[in-house]
Amino acid sequence: MDEKTKIYDITIIGGGPVGLFAAFYAGMRNASVKIIESLPQLGGQLSTLYPEKYIYDIPGYPSVRAQELVNNLIQQMKPFDPTVALEEAVQSVEKQVDGTFEIITKKDTHYSKAIIITAGNGAFEPRRLDLPEAEQYEGTNIHYFINDLSRFSGRRVAVCGGGDSAVDWALMLEKVASSVAIVHRRNAFRAHEHSVNNLEKSSIAIKTPFIPTEVLGNGDKLTHITLQEVKGDTTETLEIDDFIINYGFVSSLGPIKNWGLELERNSIVVNSKMETSIPGIYCAGDICTYDGKVKLIATGFGEAPTAVNNAMNFIDPKTRVQPMHSTSLFE
């Protein structure tokens, strides 16, 4: 059986922190695992929205930087070598005659004996730069995601936005880029006060209150942007190599609403086994709901093993739901 038709034991839809931990735990249960993620990188909101922010309610960490937590989770699951499919938004899930699930994305078709949905608040789509010519340069040097800082080494970069993501990325880029400018339509930034203080002390050129009104290029890549002062007459042209847009993201259940699952207020209803209304499909993390549900990363970390253990029992009813403790497994 080739990779395209391989039937995995467990397919995890959503590569955020809960999905990563579920992949690790499923690996401990000797399951073959695939993660399908709609974004270009693993980590979900932690990597996309606030990679440099500190999280204070993860057990065992007095504080941990969001991206560091993601990196640790990826490292934790690596020994089990799960298959990862990035930039694939799941469009439909269908149960086949033989009981396996067919999972269709915009790019491919996947097969699995059980599914765990860990999609957080749903699929993310960036709010795009609404200017003529902008779409032409998306994917070359207009960016909505950063998954490799080194690609900006020695380059002139402009960041557009005023929230945590924009300020965080500008500060990170300052360490590698030859120059960084941040463009925001208001004088005040919405980012965390500590980050704004660091921004004001940095070498980053702060362009406020300005908005981009034109992007100029040579047909192959963007070379300049024109800025217009909000409620003013001042214009400015910046010569840049890369333009990073941080206007935020829109998340929704999207196609999940059409999969036949019981829903309640844009969440998937589960029972105490983390089982949905469709046998063989489980949920963990913010996307699911039950009486008394608390939406925290720490809660999702507890739900993931419950989902995995019950999924394994669904695949093979002779399999114990309660596994051995990890101290015994790794001796």
From Swiss-Prot:
Keywords from the named record: FAD, Flavoprotein, NADP, Oxidoreductase
Superkingdom as given in the UniProt entry: Bacteria
Pfam families xrefs: Pyr_redox_2 (PF07992)
Catalytic activity entry: 2 reduced [2Fe-2S]-[ferredoxin] + NADP(+) + H(+) = 2 oxidized [2Fe-2S]-[ferredoxin] + NADPH
SUPFAM superfamilies attached to this UniProt entry: FAD/NAD(P)-binding domain (SSF51905)
Record-listed FAD binding positions: 37, 45, 50, 90, 124, 286, 327
Cofactor(s) demanded: FAD
One GO MF term: thioredoxin-disulfide reductase (NADPH) activity
Record EC number: 1.18.1.2
GO biological process: cell redox homeostasis
Cross-referenced InterPro entries: FAD/NAD-bd_sf, FAD/NAD-binding_dom, Fd--NADP_Rdtase_type_2, Ferredoxin-NADP_redctase_2
Cofactor annotation remark: Binds 1 FAD per subunit.
Subunit structure: Homodimer.
HAMAP family given in the database record: FENR2
Family as reported in the entry's similarity comment: Belongs to the ferredoxin--NADP reductase type 2 family.
Name this polypeptide is given: Ferredoxin--NADP reductase 2
Organism encoding this protein: Listeria monocytogenes serovar 1/2a (strain ATCC BAA-679 / EGD-e)
